[in-house]
Protein backbone atom coordinates (compact mmCIF):
# COMPACT_ATOMS: atom_id res chain seq x y z
CA UNK A 1 0.00 0.00 0.00
CA UNK A 2 1.18 3.51 -0.84
CA UNK A 3 1.16 6.57 1.42
CA UNK A 4 -0.45 8.34 -1.56
CA UNK A 5 -4.22 7.66 -1.41
CA UNK A 6 -5.35 5.43 -4.29
CA UNK A 7 -9.02 4.69 -4.99
CA UNK A 8 -9.89 1.02 -5.55
CA UNK A 9 -11.03 1.78 -9.11
CA UNK A 10 -7.95 3.87 -9.92
CA UNK A 11 -5.86 2.77 -12.90
CA UNK A 12 -2.67 3.69 -11.07
CA UNK A 13 -2.07 1.81 -7.79
CA UNK A 14 1.40 0.98 -6.50
CA UNK A 15 1.20 -2.34 -8.43
CA UNK A 16 1.22 -0.37 -11.72
CA UNK A 17 3.58 2.66 -11.70
CA UNK A 18 3.48 3.54 -15.42
CA UNK A 19 5.92 6.01 -16.93
CA UNK A 20 4.98 9.14 -18.85
CA UNK A 21 6.19 12.59 -19.85
CA UNK A 22 4.41 15.66 -18.49
CA UNK A 23 4.70 19.41 -18.04
CA UNK A 24 2.90 21.99 -15.93
CA UNK A 25 2.00 25.64 -16.31
CA UNK A 26 4.56 26.57 -13.67
CA UNK A 27 7.26 24.42 -15.30
CA UNK A 28 6.69 24.00 -19.06
CA UNK A 29 9.72 21.73 -19.57
CA UNK A 30 8.57 18.15 -20.36
CA UNK A 31 9.88 15.71 -17.79
CA UNK A 32 9.53 12.07 -16.81
CA UNK A 33 6.98 11.07 -14.21
CA UNK A 34 5.28 8.03 -12.74
CA UNK A 35 1.53 7.89 -12.10
CA UNK A 36 0.35 6.94 -8.60
CA UNK A 37 -3.32 7.45 -7.76
CA UNK A 38 -4.30 10.90 -9.04
CA UNK A 39 -0.72 12.19 -8.65
CA UNK A 40 2.46 12.25 -10.75
CA UNK A 41 5.82 11.61 -9.11
CA UNK A 42 8.44 13.76 -10.88
CA UNK A 43 11.50 11.53 -11.35
CA UNK A 44 13.74 14.49 -12.16
CA UNK A 45 13.21 15.69 -8.58
CA UNK A 46 14.02 12.35 -6.93
CA UNK A 47 16.64 11.03 -9.36
CA UNK A 48 19.29 11.14 -6.60
CA UNK A 49 17.36 8.40 -4.77
CA UNK A 50 18.08 5.82 -7.50
CA UNK A 51 21.28 4.47 -5.97
CA UNK A 52 21.31 0.83 -7.07
CA UNK A 53 24.03 -0.72 -9.25
CA UNK A 54 22.10 -0.37 -12.52
CA UNK A 55 20.99 3.25 -12.07
CA UNK A 56 23.48 5.02 -9.80
CA UNK A 57 25.60 6.02 -12.81
CA UNK A 58 22.58 6.71 -15.02
CA UNK A 59 20.47 9.02 -12.85
CA UNK A 60 20.66 11.60 -15.66
CA UNK A 61 18.15 9.60 -17.74
CA UNK A 62 15.43 11.00 -15.47
CA UNK A 63 16.43 14.54 -16.48
CA UNK A 64 15.57 13.80 -20.11
CA UNK A 65 12.42 15.04 -21.86
CA UNK A 66 11.59 11.57 -23.22
CA UNK A 67 11.87 7.99 -21.98
CA UNK A 68 14.16 6.82 -24.82
CA UNK A 69 17.40 6.69 -22.85
CA UNK A 70 15.76 4.98 -19.87
CA UNK A 71 14.14 2.47 -22.24
CA UNK A 72 17.54 1.76 -23.74
CA UNK A 73 19.12 0.82 -20.39
CA UNK A 74 17.39 -2.56 -20.36
CA UNK A 75 15.69 -4.88 -17.91
CA UNK A 76 18.13 -4.61 -15.00
CA UNK A 77 17.62 -0.84 -14.84
CA UNK A 78 13.84 -1.12 -15.30
CA UNK A 79 13.50 -3.68 -12.51
CA UNK A 80 15.71 -1.66 -10.21
CA UNK A 81 13.74 1.53 -10.89
CA UNK A 82 10.44 -0.25 -10.24
CA UNK A 83 11.66 -1.79 -6.97
CA UNK A 84 13.02 1.59 -5.81
CA UNK A 85 9.77 3.36 -6.65
CA UNK A 86 7.61 0.78 -4.91
CA UNK A 87 9.84 1.08 -1.85
CA UNK A 88 9.83 4.91 -1.84
CA UNK A 89 6.04 5.05 -2.27
CA UNK A 90 5.31 2.41 0.35
CA UNK A 91 3.28 3.55 3.35
CA UNK A 92 5.89 1.97 5.63
CA UNK A 93 8.87 3.89 4.22
CA UNK A 94 9.70 7.30 5.68
CA UNK A 95 12.29 8.56 3.14
CA UNK A 96 9.80 10.28 0.84
CA UNK A 97 6.70 10.06 3.03
CA UNK A 98 8.10 12.22 5.84
CA UNK A 99 10.16 14.71 3.83
CA UNK A 100 7.52 17.41 3.37
CA UNK A 101 9.75 19.72 1.32
CA UNK A 102 10.75 16.95 -1.09
CA UNK A 103 7.16 15.67 -1.36
CA UNK A 104 5.93 19.16 -2.21
CA UNK A 105 8.44 19.43 -5.06
CA UNK A 106 8.10 15.84 -6.26
CA UNK A 107 4.33 15.41 -6.61
CA UNK A 108 2.00 17.06 -9.10
CA UNK A 109 -1.71 16.42 -9.50
CA UNK A 110 -2.54 14.77 -12.81
CA UNK A 111 -5.39 17.25 -13.25
CA UNK A 112 -2.90 20.14 -13.47
CA UNK A 113 -0.46 18.40 -15.84
CA UNK A 114 -0.22 18.35 -19.62
CA UNK A 115 0.82 14.97 -21.01
CA UNK A 116 3.20 14.53 -23.95
CA UNK A 117 4.30 11.61 -26.10
CA UNK A 118 6.34 9.36 -23.81
CA UNK A 119 9.16 8.84 -26.30
CA UNK A 120 10.62 10.11 -29.53
CA UNK A 121 9.24 7.44 -31.86
CA UNK A 122 11.80 6.80 -34.56
CA UNK A 123 9.87 4.03 -36.31
CA UNK A 124 6.34 2.67 -36.05
CA UNK A 125 5.18 -0.74 -37.28
CA UNK A 126 1.56 -1.91 -37.27
CA UNK A 127 0.80 -5.62 -37.24
CA UNK A 128 -2.41 -7.44 -38.18
CA UNK A 129 -2.37 -10.11 -35.49
CA UNK A 130 -6.01 -10.74 -34.52
CA UNK A 131 -7.28 -13.80 -36.36
CA UNK A 132 -10.91 -12.80 -35.90
CA UNK A 133 -10.29 -9.31 -37.28
CA UNK A 134 -8.34 -10.61 -40.26
CA UNK A 135 -11.08 -13.17 -40.91
CA UNK A 136 -13.86 -10.59 -40.65
CA UNK A 137 -12.16 -8.22 -43.07
CA UNK A 138 -11.34 -11.09 -45.43
CA UNK A 139 -14.97 -12.25 -45.50
CA UNK A 140 -16.19 -8.71 -46.23
CA UNK A 141 -13.82 -8.11 -49.12
CA UNK A 142 -12.97 -11.59 -50.48
CA UNK A 143 -15.63 -14.00 -49.20
CA UNK A 144 -15.50 -16.86 -46.67
CA UNK A 145 -13.46 -19.17 -48.90
CA UNK A 146 -10.54 -16.69 -49.09
CA UNK A 147 -10.93 -14.92 -45.75
CA UNK A 148 -7.34 -15.51 -44.60
CA UNK A 149 -4.56 -15.04 -47.13
CA UNK A 150 -2.09 -17.96 -47.43
CA UNK A 151 0.67 -16.30 -45.38
CA UNK A 152 -1.45 -15.21 -42.40
CA UNK A 153 -1.14 -18.37 -40.27
CA UNK A 154 2.60 -18.62 -40.94
CA UNK A 155 3.90 -15.16 -39.98
CA UNK A 156 2.78 -11.99 -38.17
CA UNK A 157 1.78 -9.74 -41.06
CA UNK A 158 2.69 -6.07 -40.62
CA UNK A 159 3.46 -2.82 -42.41
CA UNK A 160 5.50 0.27 -41.66
CA UNK A 161 3.36 3.17 -40.44
CA UNK A 162 4.03 6.87 -40.11
CA UNK A 163 5.76 7.84 -36.85
CA UNK A 164 5.44 11.61 -37.34
CA UNK A 165 1.64 11.59 -37.06
CA UNK A 166 1.44 9.63 -33.80
CA UNK A 167 -0.15 11.93 -31.22
CA UNK A 168 -0.89 11.74 -27.51
CA UNK A 169 -4.38 11.20 -26.13
CA UNK A 170 -6.56 14.31 -26.25
CA UNK A 171 -5.16 15.60 -29.55
CA UNK A 172 -7.97 16.27 -32.07
CA UNK A 173 -7.87 14.35 -35.36
CA UNK A 174 -8.69 16.17 -38.59
CA UNK A 175 -10.87 14.27 -41.06
CA UNK A 176 -8.46 13.56 -43.91
CA UNK A 177 -8.75 14.60 -47.53
CA UNK A 178 -7.77 12.13 -50.21
CA UNK A 179 -8.50 10.26 -53.38
CA UNK A 180 -11.22 7.59 -53.41
CA UNK A 181 -13.47 5.74 -55.81
CA UNK A 182 -16.94 5.37 -54.26
CA UNK A 183 -18.46 4.28 -57.59
CA UNK A 184 -16.44 1.65 -59.47
CA UNK A 185 -18.19 2.60 -62.71
CA UNK A 186 -16.81 6.15 -62.50
CA UNK A 187 -13.34 7.73 -62.21
CA UNK A 188 -11.88 8.40 -58.74
CA UNK A 189 -12.67 11.64 -56.93
CA UNK A 190 -10.84 13.89 -54.47
CA UNK A 191 -12.49 15.02 -51.28
CA UNK A 192 -13.04 14.50 -47.58
CA UNK A 193 -13.02 10.93 -46.29
CA UNK A 194 -16.59 9.65 -45.93
CA UNK A 195 -15.83 6.36 -44.15
CA UNK A 196 -13.72 7.43 -41.16
CA UNK A 197 -13.07 4.60 -38.70
CA UNK A 198 -11.37 3.89 -35.40
CA UNK A 199 -9.33 0.79 -34.60
CA UNK A 200 -8.94 -0.63 -31.10
CA UNK A 201 -5.27 -1.56 -30.73
CA UNK A 202 -2.47 -1.83 -28.21
CA UNK A 203 1.21 -1.20 -28.83
CA UNK A 204 4.53 -1.79 -27.13
CA UNK A 205 7.67 0.32 -26.92
CA UNK A 206 11.01 -1.25 -27.78
CA UNK A 207 13.70 -1.00 -25.11
CA UNK A 208 17.27 -1.90 -26.10
CA UNK A 209 17.63 -2.33 -29.83
CA UNK A 210 19.68 -4.76 -31.88
CA UNK A 211 22.67 -4.18 -34.10
CA UNK A 212 22.11 -3.76 -37.81
CA UNK A 213 22.19 -7.19 -39.43
CA UNK A 214 21.78 -9.14 -36.16
CA UNK A 215 18.31 -10.63 -35.48
CA UNK A 216 16.80 -10.89 -32.00
CA UNK A 217 16.16 -14.57 -31.14
CA UNK A 218 12.74 -15.27 -29.69
CA UNK A 219 14.31 -16.51 -26.45
CA UNK A 220 15.66 -12.97 -25.89
CA UNK A 221 12.72 -10.98 -27.28
CA UNK A 222 11.20 -10.22 -23.86
CA UNK A 223 14.38 -8.36 -22.90
CA UNK A 224 13.62 -5.78 -25.61
CA UNK A 225 9.99 -4.98 -24.66
CA UNK A 226 9.66 -2.02 -22.28
CA UNK A 227 5.91 -1.58 -21.82
CA UNK A 228 2.51 -1.10 -23.42
CA UNK A 229 0.05 1.66 -24.34
CA UNK A 230 -3.45 1.85 -25.79
CA UNK A 231 -3.77 2.88 -29.43
CA UNK A 232 -6.41 4.14 -31.84
CA UNK A 233 -5.21 3.60 -35.40
CA UNK A 234 -7.61 5.98 -37.13
CA UNK A 235 -8.45 4.73 -40.63
CA UNK A 236 -9.97 6.31 -43.73
CA UNK A 237 -11.61 3.23 -45.22
CA UNK A 238 -12.58 4.72 -48.58
CA UNK A 239 -9.10 6.19 -49.17
CA UNK A 240 -7.53 2.93 -47.99
CA UNK A 241 -9.67 0.72 -50.23
CA UNK A 242 -8.75 2.63 -53.38
CA UNK A 243 -5.01 3.00 -52.68
CA UNK A 244 -3.90 -0.20 -50.95
CA UNK A 245 -3.26 -2.48 -53.97
CA UNK A 246 -0.49 -3.54 -54.42
CA UNK A 247 1.65 -2.01 -51.64
CA UNK A 248 -0.73 -1.76 -48.67
CA UNK A 249 -1.96 1.14 -46.51
CA UNK A 250 -0.65 4.65 -47.10
CA UNK A 251 -2.72 7.85 -46.80
CA UNK A 252 -5.68 5.93 -45.41
CA UNK A 253 -3.67 5.42 -42.22
CA UNK A 254 -0.90 8.03 -42.02
CA UNK A 255 -3.05 11.05 -41.11
CA UNK A 256 -3.18 10.24 -37.39
CA UNK A 257 -2.61 7.58 -34.73
CA UNK A 258 -3.45 8.21 -31.06
CA UNK A 259 -1.74 6.56 -28.08
CA UNK A 260 -2.34 6.80 -24.34
CA UNK A 261 0.31 8.80 -22.46
CA UNK A 262 1.20 6.28 -19.72
CA UNK A 263 3.46 3.35 -20.58
CA UNK A 264 2.60 0.38 -18.37
CA UNK A 265 5.78 -1.65 -17.72
CA UNK A 266 5.72 -5.34 -18.56
CA UNK A 267 6.48 -6.25 -14.93
CA UNK A 268 3.15 -4.69 -13.95
CA UNK A 269 1.38 -6.87 -16.52
CA UNK A 270 3.07 -10.19 -15.73
CA UNK A 271 0.55 -11.14 -12.98
CA UNK A 272 -2.08 -11.13 -15.74
CA UNK A 273 -0.27 -13.36 -18.22
CA UNK A 274 -2.37 -16.16 -19.75
CA UNK A 275 -1.48 -19.14 -21.97
CA UNK A 276 -0.59 -18.35 -25.56
CA UNK A 277 -3.20 -19.21 -28.21
CA UNK A 278 -2.91 -22.55 -29.94
CA UNK A 279 -1.27 -21.97 -33.32
CA UNK A 280 -2.06 -24.41 -36.09
CA UNK A 281 -0.08 -24.94 -38.23
CA UNK A 282 2.87 -24.72 -35.87
CA UNK A 283 5.04 -21.72 -36.82
CA UNK A 284 8.56 -22.11 -38.15
CA UNK A 285 11.13 -22.72 -35.38
CA UNK A 286 12.35 -19.10 -35.19
CA UNK A 287 8.80 -18.07 -34.16
CA UNK A 288 8.18 -20.83 -31.59
CA UNK A 289 8.21 -20.09 -27.87
CA UNK A 290 6.74 -21.85 -24.86
CA UNK A 291 6.91 -18.84 -22.53
CA UNK A 292 3.39 -17.47 -21.89
CA UNK A 293 3.26 -13.93 -23.27
CA UNK A 294 -0.42 -13.22 -23.83
CA UNK A 295 -2.21 -10.91 -21.38
CA UNK A 296 -5.70 -10.63 -19.94
CA UNK A 297 -6.34 -6.93 -20.57
CA UNK A 298 -9.97 -5.79 -20.61
CA UNK A 299 -10.56 -3.21 -23.32
CA UNK A 300 -13.48 -0.97 -24.21
CA UNK A 301 -14.30 1.68 -26.79
CA UNK A 302 -16.80 4.46 -26.14
CA UNK A 303 -18.17 7.08 -28.53
CA UNK A 304 -19.49 10.51 -27.58
CA UNK A 305 -21.12 12.45 -30.37
CA UNK A 306 -22.09 16.11 -30.39
CA UNK A 307 -25.26 16.56 -28.37
CA UNK A 308 -24.75 13.34 -26.40
CA UNK A 309 -24.74 13.85 -22.63
CA UNK A 310 -22.46 10.87 -22.05
CA UNK A 311 -20.32 8.44 -24.02
CA UNK A 312 -21.82 5.13 -25.17
CA UNK A 313 -19.80 1.90 -25.12
CA UNK A 314 -19.69 0.38 -28.61
CA UNK A 315 -17.08 -2.36 -28.08
CA UNK A 316 -15.77 -4.57 -25.27
CA UNK A 317 -12.81 -6.74 -26.13
CA UNK A 318 -9.66 -8.25 -24.63
CA UNK A 319 -5.99 -8.32 -25.63
CA UNK A 320 -5.92 -12.09 -25.03
CA UNK A 321 -7.73 -12.51 -28.36
CA UNK A 322 -4.45 -11.90 -30.23
CA UNK A 323 -3.14 -14.82 -32.32
CA UNK A 324 0.48 -13.68 -32.68
CA UNK A 325 2.36 -12.66 -29.51
CA UNK A 326 4.55 -9.62 -29.00
CA UNK A 327 7.60 -11.90 -28.79
CA UNK A 328 6.77 -13.28 -32.23
CA UNK A 329 6.14 -9.82 -33.65
CA UNK A 330 9.45 -8.44 -32.41
CA UNK A 331 11.44 -11.50 -33.48
CA UNK A 332 9.87 -11.57 -36.93
CA UNK A 333 10.52 -7.83 -37.34
CA UNK A 334 14.24 -8.35 -36.74
CA UNK A 335 14.72 -11.75 -38.41
CA UNK A 336 16.09 -10.19 -41.59
CA UNK A 337 18.59 -8.10 -39.61
CA UNK A 338 16.41 -4.99 -39.37
CA UNK A 339 17.70 -2.94 -36.46
CA UNK A 340 15.18 -1.77 -33.87
CA UNK A 341 15.88 1.19 -31.58
CA UNK A 342 14.76 2.38 -28.14
CA UNK A 343 11.41 4.13 -28.48
CA UNK A 344 10.29 2.30 -31.61
CA UNK A 345 6.58 1.48 -31.42
CA UNK A 346 5.10 -1.86 -32.54
CA UNK A 347 1.31 -2.12 -32.65
CA UNK A 348 -0.94 -5.16 -32.39
CA UNK A 349 -3.40 -4.47 -35.17
CA UNK A 350 -7.13 -4.28 -34.53
CA UNK A 351 -8.20 -6.42 -31.56
CA UNK A 352 -11.40 -8.37 -32.23
CA UNK A 353 -12.92 -11.34 -30.43
CA UNK A 354 -15.47 -13.87 -31.65
CA UNK A 355 -18.45 -12.02 -30.15
CA UNK A 356 -19.75 -9.25 -32.48
CA UNK A 357 -19.70 -6.81 -29.54
CA UNK A 358 -15.94 -7.42 -29.27
CA UNK A 359 -15.18 -6.35 -32.85
CA UNK A 360 -12.54 -3.62 -32.63
CA UNK A 361 -13.47 -1.41 -35.59
CA UNK A 362 -16.60 0.25 -36.94
CA UNK A 363 -15.94 -1.49 -40.24
CA UNK A 364 -16.68 -4.76 -38.42
CA UNK A 365 -19.31 -3.45 -35.98
CA UNK A 366 -21.33 -2.05 -38.91
CA UNK A 367 -20.27 -4.93 -41.18
CA UNK A 368 -18.96 -2.64 -43.92
CA UNK A 369 -21.66 -0.07 -43.31
CA UNK A 370 -24.64 -2.43 -43.68
CA UNK A 371 -25.68 -2.41 -39.99
CA UNK A 372 -26.35 0.59 -37.77
CA UNK A 373 -24.34 0.80 -34.55
CA UNK A 374 -26.52 1.95 -31.66
CA UNK A 375 -24.80 4.72 -29.71
CA UNK A 376 -27.86 5.34 -27.50
CA UNK A 377 -29.87 8.51 -27.02
CA UNK A 378 -31.55 7.87 -30.36
CA UNK A 379 -28.33 8.03 -32.37
CA UNK A 380 -26.70 5.44 -34.61
CA UNK A 381 -23.47 5.27 -36.59
CA UNK A 382 -21.91 3.25 -39.35
CA UNK A 383 -18.73 5.34 -39.45
CA UNK A 384 -17.52 8.39 -37.52
CA UNK A 385 -19.10 11.83 -37.84
CA UNK A 386 -17.42 15.19 -37.29
CA UNK A 387 -17.50 16.01 -33.59
CA UNK A 388 -17.42 12.37 -32.49
CA UNK A 389 -15.00 11.62 -29.67
CA UNK A 390 -13.61 8.09 -29.42
CA UNK A 391 -12.37 6.98 -25.98
CA UNK A 392 -10.42 3.73 -25.50
CA UNK A 393 -9.76 2.40 -22.00
CA UNK A 394 -8.09 -0.76 -20.74
CA UNK A 395 -7.21 -2.44 -17.47
CA UNK A 396 -6.17 -5.72 -15.84
CA UNK A 397 -8.31 -6.66 -12.85
CA UNK A 398 -6.43 -7.78 -9.75
CA UNK A 399 -7.68 -8.75 -6.30
CA UNK A 400 -8.85 -5.40 -4.92
CA UNK A 401 -6.87 -3.34 -7.42
CA UNK A 402 -6.58 -2.75 -11.16
CA UNK A 403 -3.62 -2.07 -13.40
CA UNK A 404 -4.91 0.40 -15.98
CA UNK A 405 -3.73 2.47 -18.91
CA UNK A 406 -5.74 5.68 -18.51
CA UNK A 407 -7.48 6.97 -21.63
CA UNK A 408 -6.66 7.01 -25.33
CA UNK A 409 -9.04 9.66 -26.65
CA UNK A 410 -9.44 11.85 -29.71
CA UNK A 411 -12.16 14.01 -31.26
CA UNK A 412 -12.86 14.23 -35.00
CA UNK A 413 -12.53 17.70 -36.52
CA UNK A 414 -14.10 18.59 -39.90
CA UNK A 415 -11.93 18.29 -43.00
CA UNK A 416 -10.21 21.39 -44.27
CA UNK A 417 -11.79 22.85 -47.38
CA UNK A 418 -10.07 21.72 -50.60
CA UNK A 419 -7.40 24.14 -51.80
UniProtKB/Swiss-Prot annotation:
E.C. number(s) listed in UniProt: 3.7.1.2
Reactions catalysed: 4-fumarylacetoacetate + H2O = acetoacetate + fumarate + H(+)
Pathway the protein takes part in: Amino-acid degradation; L-phenylalanine degradation; acetoacetate and fumarate from L-phenylalanine: step 6/6
Keyword Cell inner membrane among record annotations: no
Alphabetical GO biological process terms: arginine catabolic process; L-phenylalanine catabolic process; lipid metabolic process; tyrosine catabolic process
Binding site for Ca(2+): 126, 199, 201, 233
Keyword Phosphoprotein tagged: yes
Name of the protein in question: Fumarylacetoacetase
Species annotation: Mus musculus (Mouse)
Gene of this entry: Fah
